[in-house]
């Protein structure tokens, strides 16, 4: 078996994981809107579909355990590793990502 790390397959799994994860969150958002508008049956369909997307995303992530967290590159799999990866991801968000986005957005806000 060839190494998954730095392969086209790893790249594809990361892209598929991101797509399935985003679909899950969109469908949950759509379900919430359907609930607010009184479409309870539609909301239930969105939630069921979101759960399916979760299963797909988890399947991709299971393969990616071999190469690490797709967001941080940290090892994942055990609870200890998962906690470290989650902390690394959240730390990146508040120390780098959002600060960078603020600096990029500032000129737009001023125009």
PLM features: what roles do these ranges have?
Residues 2-12, 68-92:
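Acidic/His metal-coordination segments adjacent to aromatic residues that form catalytic metal sites
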Residues 20:
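Divalent metal-coordination and catalytic microenvironments
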Residues 40-72:
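Conserved alpha-helical segments that form or flank metal/cofactor-binding pockets of metalloenzymes
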Residues 102-111:
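Single conserved hydrophobic/aromatic residue that forms the stacking wall/gate
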